[in-house]
Amino acid sequence: MVKFAKSKLKYFDCLINNASIFENDKLENFNSSSWEKHLSINLKAPAILSREFGKNIKGKNNNIINIIDQRVFKLTPFFFSYTLSKTGLYTLTKTSAMSLAPRVRVNGIAPGPTIKNKRQSKGHFRRQYLSTLLKKQVDVEEICSAVDFFIKNRSITVQVISIDSGQSLNWQTPDVLKGKE
């Protein structure tokens, strides 16, 4: 995939790992199928793409930006397989930055409530983002601005920015509220 993209694009100096699966499970009820899907899509694919990007890219001003999740900073027992795969992606961000420097800078973005997931009602999503410190939904453009920031700042690597309206610090998670996500 990396070789194909490089052959088709005039400039290819940035890989953004954004694909993700987000299914709810817990330690008590996760199954092998969901576990494998989460690890394959959320961690294995970015690892392989990052490896191939590092092998096939020239020059020094190259970037990998991993879209992680604020959940890596505010752990809950919900979305067990998803959270483990995203904490793995967080670690991949750090370790691949060390491996690929100085040719490739690797950073991450940990968004909060940006888009309503397919299982949520509009009301539940609204309650979710209103429970953040800033009481607002994250705008996709704010995430795009962070991508632009990482690309333009050549001295930044191994950083993960939370763009989560303060969710990772103050979100009233279901485990705290004794509720159900």
Regions found by a protein language model. Give the residues of each.
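Hydrophobic positions on the long internal alpha-helix
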Residues: M1, I16, L49-F53, I57, ...
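Active-site loop of short-chain dehydrogenase/reductase
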Residues: Y11-D13, N56-I68, P102-V104, Q159
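Conserved NAD(P)H cofactor-binding loop of Rossmann-fold oxidoreductase domains
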Residues: N18-E23, G166
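Substrate-binding pocket helix/loop in short-chain dehydrogenase/reductase
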Residues: K26-L27, S34-E36, Q128
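Catalytic loop of short-chain dehydrogenase/reductase
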Residues: N63-G88, T93-A101, P113, Q167
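Conserved Rossmann-fold SDR core element
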Residues: Y90, L100-T114, I156-I163
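C-terminal substrate-recognition "lid" of short-chain dehydrogenase/reductases
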Residues: V140-I163, S168
